[in-house]
């Protein structure tokens, strides 16, 4: 075993106590995430809940509990949001790159396992195969020590460590043994710095969520004047009892609020989470489903994302010196079987040649980083070595030049050769005779090519980035259909604009540092791209966090899984197209649902304003002010089959239409004109049917019923338009919705319960006629809007 001059028996108890007192222990400071109280407050005290809460109190003041059922939406909206964010908090709080590793710490009082927070500066920590490096340090003892730093650097190959070399927290031992002295502990360690940066709380960007918030803000501004006007006119200008006035006022205010829009959006996201969960895809933030459907650039980390761990033998080229009785396949199988601690290359050979001939081993020389070869002497089959061609061959030989040519393609090349002396001889391997070149390549995930082809069809560009060498990265990219020269990231410009321009010219990048991965994401975003980052290592954490959507592999580091919005638990890259599909379903369906809810808001506000203005005009003219046409029960049944049930079904329906930006603009350009038509048509019918202050209860009920008929006809036509292009299930949604109202108006018990009276043939005829005109106007508007947006109007799919 090689020892450095700094190797010691470890610290004394007094030295340990002194370092703890000086704060030089591995106590990592608690990460800052939102508290449960902050999450609760953020989800309870929202704009939509404030609106609903005030209206609920008004309804309860009338004593009509049945009309206050919409208050349950306050609970539903809050609970769904809190559950999702608390789950995200719990995931972040569990972020621990070094996991539950128990390092073997050597001190003068003895060598034993300790928890990671007991480690102090200058502690000596022993390492063996599979052990994790828990703090940064310097190697003081080594015996063929090889460290896997792929989760930190992206470098696929294990790194041989000699005395004096540095090791970083988050890496682990592949083979050999050794010890290192802790040089950086606590928040100074490399992994701890990344963890602190990664654990800051963020929410994924969501055009749907932001758009709905903007719409709700706009609605709030409309509600204030419309609400105040309605309250004044219904309470102080009409000449009916206070309870009737309050009910009419509530009937005006309640439908102004798109009370189910936020809930339907949350349900649509939640159903997507469940569906993707069945595909072993964990969605840690609901809007991430939407986000991936909007992505136009995917930055894919090569190691662990596009490739699997390990190598595979892709070719064996026999050389001129192969005239021996032993077959190359038998020799390779025998070498693999004789290796007690195979590295990645020998494991690949063992997988390819898994039928060893059963030769008797006379001597064995394990692989050493210093010699770059391993070998076995067999009793009756000679001496065989396998290792680096540049070490075993004369650089001027034909075999060496052939190996160099193959290696330039990003492939790993090993030389199989026969030695002239036993492998345990002091002069081993002696004179070697080249027998074969064993060519290995990284294992590419079998589903990677199909997934990248899918993104290409969807016009989503893919950038392959890795800490591995550029030639190797380019070779993998080429096998996946991403052709073009790979660039060494050490030559990348540092300026954001220059970097963004360079990214447009190249597809593959090697030797990319963690901070460069982050810079690549920022540069792409600065040019207006929506960026997804896939990765599995600690070196991917910062880029995963800053990307619009972070996607981690389930087998990756705890840090990468914690900061990613989407985790592929089964490590299947091919799951991503299904996530895109779910995102499209949510985006397309919520746009339809938003049209329904906002159309209701527009016609409700307009109707309240028209009634209120009429009341204000009537006062100086000494005319009877209008009562609002509807009581809460009327607006409740109106919402059942024009919005509520259809919206729920539409929000969950299949939909693979491509997502485009401009959610708010598209919704407003349909909801506002449709709502105006419904509001005006309903008001015209009500004016024609209204009999004034001295009308009987039956006449007032008939006028309200007439207005409701017009509203239902036009609102149902909006549903019919929004449901296009038609499929059988959409027709099965629209037609029964209309039939449901026919049934309600036909049943005496329903008419009595819901305060409906369509017995006045004159007012009912007016309502039907105005309803037909309103529906025709909505149809014409739909065709005109489609032309204006440059969308081909489709009635049938």
From Swiss-Prot:
Q: What is its main location?
A: membrane
Q: Which CDD domains match?
A: P-type_ATPase (cd02609)
Top enzyme category:
translocase
Q: What one GO molecular function would you report for this record?
A: metal ion binding
Q: Can you tell me which residues form the catalytic site?
A: 301 (4-aspartylphosphate intermediate)
Topology of the protein relative to the lipid bilayer: Multi-pass membrane protein
Q: Which Pfam families match?
A: E1-E2_ATPase, Hydrolase
Membrane-spanning ranges: 55-75, 215-235, 254-274, 601-621, 633-653, 667-687, 703-723, 729-749, 764-784
What are the alphabetically sorted keywords of the record? ATP-binding, Calcium, Calcium transport, Cell membrane, Ion transport, Magnesium, Membrane, Metal-binding, Nucleotide-binding, Phosphoprotein, Translocase, Transmembrane, Transmembrane helix, Transport
Under Enzyme Commission nomenclature, its number is: 7.2.2.10
Listed under GO cellular component are: plasma membrane
Q: Does the keyword Membrane apply?
A: yes
What this protein catalyses is: Ca(2+)(in) + ATP + H2O = Ca(2+)(out) + ADP + phosphate + H(+)
Entry-linked InterPro entries: ATPase_P-typ_cyto_dom_N, ATPase_P-typ_P_site, ATPase_P-typ_TM_dom_sf, ATPase_P-typ_transduc_dom_A_sf, HAD-like_sf, HAD_sf, P_typ_ATPase, P_typ_ATPase_HD_dom
The domain of life for this entry's organism is Bacteria
Question: Where, per UniProt, does this protein localize?
Answer: Cell membrane
UniProt: Mg(2+) binding residues: 301, 303, 536
The similarity comment for this entry is: Belongs to the cation transport ATPase (P-type) (TC 3.A.3) family.
- PANTHER family found in the cross-reference section: CALCIUM-TRANSPORTING ATPASE
| Physiological role | P-type ATPase involved in specific uptake of calcium.
Name-wise, this protein is Calcium-transporting ATPase CtpE
Q: Which organism is it from?
A: Mycobacterium tuberculosis (strain CDC 1551 / Oshkosh)
| Lineage summary | Bacteria, Bacillati, Actinomycetota, Actinomycetes, Mycobacteriales
What gene is behind this protein? ctpE
């Amino acid at each position: 075993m090689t020892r450095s001059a700094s190797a010691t028996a470890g610290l004394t108890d007094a030295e340990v106590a002194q370092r703890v007192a000086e704060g030089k222990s591995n106590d990592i400071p608690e990460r800052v995430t939102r508290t449960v109280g902050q999450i609760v407050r953020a989800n309870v005290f929202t704009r939509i809940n404030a609106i609903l809460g005030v209206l609920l109190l008004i309804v309860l003041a009338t004593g009509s509990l049945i009309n206050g059922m919409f208050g349950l939406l306050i609970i539903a909206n809050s609970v769904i949001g809190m559950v999702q964010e608390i789950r995200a908090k719990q995931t972040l709080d569990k972020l621990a790159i070094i996991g539950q590793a128990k390092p073997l710490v050597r001190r003068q009082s003895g060598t034993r396992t300790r928890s990671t927070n007991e480690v102090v500066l200058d502690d000596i920590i022993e390492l063996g195969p599979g052990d994790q490096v828990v703090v940064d340090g310097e190697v003081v003892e080594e015996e063929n020590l090889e460290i896997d730093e792929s989760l930190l650097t992206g470098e696929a190959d294990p790194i041989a460590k000699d005395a004096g070399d540095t090791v970083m927290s988050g890496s682990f031992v592949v083979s050999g043994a050794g010890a290192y002295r802790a040089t950086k502990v606590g928040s100074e360690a490399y992994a701890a710095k990344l963890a602190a940066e990664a654990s800051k709380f963020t929410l994924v960007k969501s055009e749907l969520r932001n758009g709905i918030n903007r719409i709700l803000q706009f609605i709030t501004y409309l509600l204030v004047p419309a609400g105040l006007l309605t309250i004044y006119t219904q309470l102080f200008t009409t000449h009916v009892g206070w309870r009737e006035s309050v009910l009419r006022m509530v009937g005006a205010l309640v439908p102004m609020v798109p009370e189910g829009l936020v809930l339907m959006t949350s349900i649509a996201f939640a159903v997507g989470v469940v569906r993707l969960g069945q595909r072993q895809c964990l969605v840690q933030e609901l809007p991430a489903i939407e986000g991936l459907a909007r992505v136009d650039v995917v930055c894919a980390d090569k190691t662990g994302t596009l490739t699997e761990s390990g190598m595979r033998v892709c070719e064996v080229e026999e050389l001129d010196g192969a005239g021996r009785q032993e077959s190359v396949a038998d020799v390779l199988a025998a070498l693999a079987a004789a290796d007690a601690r195979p590295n990645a290359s020998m494991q690949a050979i063992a997988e390819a040649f898994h039928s060893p001939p059963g030769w008797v081993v006379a001597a064995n020389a394990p692989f050493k980083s210093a010699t770059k070869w391993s070998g076995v002497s067999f009793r009756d089959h000679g001496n065989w070595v396998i290792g680096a061609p540049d070490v075993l061959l004369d650089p001027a030989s034909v075999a060496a030049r052939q190996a160099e040519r193959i290696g330039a393609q990003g492939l790993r090349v090993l030389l199989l050769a026969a030695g002239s002396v036993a492998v345990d001889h002091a002069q081993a391997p002696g004179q070697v005779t080249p027998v074969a070149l064993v060519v290995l390549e990284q294992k590419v995930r079998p589903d990677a090519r199909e997934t990248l082809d899918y993104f290409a069809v969807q016009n989503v560009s893919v950038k392959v980035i890795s800490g591995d060498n550029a030639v190797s990265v380019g070779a993998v990219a080429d096998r996946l259909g991403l052709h073009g020269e790979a660039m060494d990231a050490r030559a990348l410009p540092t300026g954001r604009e220059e970097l963004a321009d360079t990214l447009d010219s190249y597809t593959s990048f090697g030797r990319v540092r963690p901070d460069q991965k982050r810079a690549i994401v920022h540069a792409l975003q600065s040019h207006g791209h929506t960026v997804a980052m896939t990765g599995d290592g600690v070196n991917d954490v910062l880029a995963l966090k800053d990307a619009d959507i972070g996607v981690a592999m389930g087998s990756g580091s705890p840090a990468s899984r914690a900061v990613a919005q989407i985790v592929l638990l089964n490590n299947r890259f091919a799951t991503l197209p299904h996530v895109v599909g779910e995102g499209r379903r949510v985006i397309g369906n919520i746009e339809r649902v938003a049209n329904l809810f906002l159309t209701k808001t527009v016609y409700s506000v307009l109707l309240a304003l028209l009634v209120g203005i009429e009341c204000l005009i009537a006062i100086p003219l000494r005319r009877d002010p209008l009562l609002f046409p509807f009581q809460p029960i009327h607006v409740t049944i109106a919402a059942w089959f024009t919005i509520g049930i259809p919206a729920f079904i539409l929000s969950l329906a299949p939909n693979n239409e491509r997502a485009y930006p401009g959610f708010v603009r598209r919704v407003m350009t349909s909801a506002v004109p449709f709502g105006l038509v419904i509001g005006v048509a309903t008001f015209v019918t009500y004016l024609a049917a209204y009999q004034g202050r001295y009308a009987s209860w039956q006449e007032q009920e008939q006028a309200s019923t007439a207005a409701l008929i017009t509203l239902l006809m036009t609102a149902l036509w909006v549903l019919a338009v929004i449901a296009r292009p038609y499929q059988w299930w959409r027709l099965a949604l629209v037609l029964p919705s209309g039939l449901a109202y026919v049934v309600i108006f036909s049943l005496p018990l329903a008419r009595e319960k819901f305060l409906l009276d369509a017995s006045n043939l004159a007012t009912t005829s007016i309502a039907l006629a105005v309803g037909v005109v309103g529906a025709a106007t909505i149809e014409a508007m739909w065709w005109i809007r489609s032309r204006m947006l440059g969308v081909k109007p489709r009635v049938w799919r």
